[in-house]
Amino acid sequence: MATQTKRGRDTRQALIKAGIEEINRYGVANVSVRRIAATCGVSCGAPYKHFGDRREFIAAIIDYVNGQWHVQQAQILAAYAGDTKAQIVEMSTGYVKFLVEHPHLRAILTLKDEEFDNVYHKMRGEVESPTQQLIQRYCEEYAIPPDVRLRKVYVIRALIMGAAIQFENGEMTYGADTLQMVHDSIQRELELP
């Protein structure tokens, strides 16, 4: 019985990973559960055994991607505990690294698709929420007004996504120097009034 359970977990994991590749290749609207099952070498009914329906399957993929980032996020937060500014800067820089080094996951995190409803949008937003919460805490610690906080959230998110896109399309070479530039830009934004 334990072997079947492990095999079931392995199948579920394989389906999720194949689902990520499927979304990268075809987009959410064109996801084929049959194609994913074939990729994994399982029956076309197997995904429904693990996920119920297509929506649950996509939600499981998003949850998996969130989990991958949450592991790294927790390590960063622990390493810089007690220093909100450092947590923001390091987590933001870490997120850029995560997006660049895991392009198959980035596609899920940055996905914009008509088929996504508010639940999927909320699940994807959970990845970025801690950064916004940290910025809010930082602004409260330094009595920074709400309008300035909104600007800081906007600029930091723009720096994160802009850097990831520029690294991906070759406008900037991904490396220690350019990553340090992103790091320093985020830090500078926090220090600006």
Stretches found by the model and what they are:
Residues 1-10:
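N-terminal intrinsically disordered/low-complexity leader segments
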Residues 58-65, 109, 120:
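Alpha-helical DNA-contacting segments of helix-turn-helix folds
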Residues 67-70, 74, 116-143, 150-154, ...:
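Amphipathic alpha-helical packing segments from all-alpha helical-bundle domains
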Residues 60, 74-101, 156:
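Hydrophobic alpha-helical connector segments
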Residues 73-80, 109-116, 167-171:
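Secondary-structure edge/capping motif, primarily at the C-terminal ends of alpha-helices
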Residues 11-14, 18, 22-56, 60:
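Helix-turn-helix
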Residues 146-169, 177-186:
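Hydrophobic alpha-helical segments that form the core
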Residues 97-133, 165:
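Short secondary-structure transition hinges
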